[in-house]
């Protein structure tokens, strides 16, 4: 059989289809056959959005100083440098495809005027001061070293530095996620400062404590919360040095103090401790993460490169990227703060991990005292989450 004759009908068919595709496009229609190649690429999982990348604190610190000179005095929340992932340059201010992070600096005496937006925000203070605070929906949240502050969606917030030294923090906002949902709203307050409650006893954040007023209905969401570092650090000391998993080391969630669930509906925050000499196992998740190095040094090893990190550095980890942590020191632990888009994926049933389920996969410690003379069935009268 003449192969050239066989190819002629196929070429004619291809030309017919190509002509149809052009006519359909003029009517803003597209055949599913055009998308088939994109579906085939998803076999085995998505392609990571962006690349693993590290921003060195020494370089960022210089850039912040230069920005201070270039901008001059400011009264807005704009002395902020966003970490733009080199693999996401077409998405604007994207550190991962869902979260944008960056450092913000407020000079002594400055007030960054009040505004609100539908993006939720976390603020991890890297250089605090006893006289600095953020006001969130009328509540004063102090900003001391390594404190974590929560600004829920559409909460009024303004930043104040009444101290005598610069204050710096790491911002994280779910901008990419909200942009993809078409849900970005913004509103300036119209004045530098919002009204602040006269007493902390009136605060919603105060009511997130485990001692709460009996005469009030409690709130579970949009809580303006501060997680003081001194309390977080004390909780780390409760756990044995080798506690945790061979993947993440000791990873503790900044839980919503009322529900016990994730930090926010769209973002979860962790503090991690990598024990001296930690050499973690490789794993990947369908979620993305941004990590700040509180102390120590080590590496994040991916399939393509080894990223070295030191104190103050920030690392972007794209979704579905194999990686593992190591701690260079045989003496000192590594401490990490990180933000994740895990809750958003969990809400849609789309959180996936390899090589095994890690998050929420291990039962909580069981009652260590079984009955010596059993009368009832083991586990009788227990709750399901105890079994």
Curated annotation (Swiss-Prot):
Gene3D superfamilies: Jelly Rolls. Its cofactor is Fe(2+). Its EC number is 1.13.11.38. Keywords: Dioxygenase, Iron, Oxidoreductase. GO terms for biological process: phenanthrene catabolic process; protein homooligomerization. The gene is phdI. This is 1-hydroxy-2-naphthoate 1,2-dioxygenasee. The lineage of its organism: Bacteria, Bacillati, Actinomycetota, Actinomycetes, Propionibacteriales. SUPFAM superfamilies: RmlC-like cupins (SSF51182). PANTHER family: 1,2-DIOXYGENASE PROTEIN-RELATED, CUPIN. It is an enzyme of class 1 (oxidoreductase).
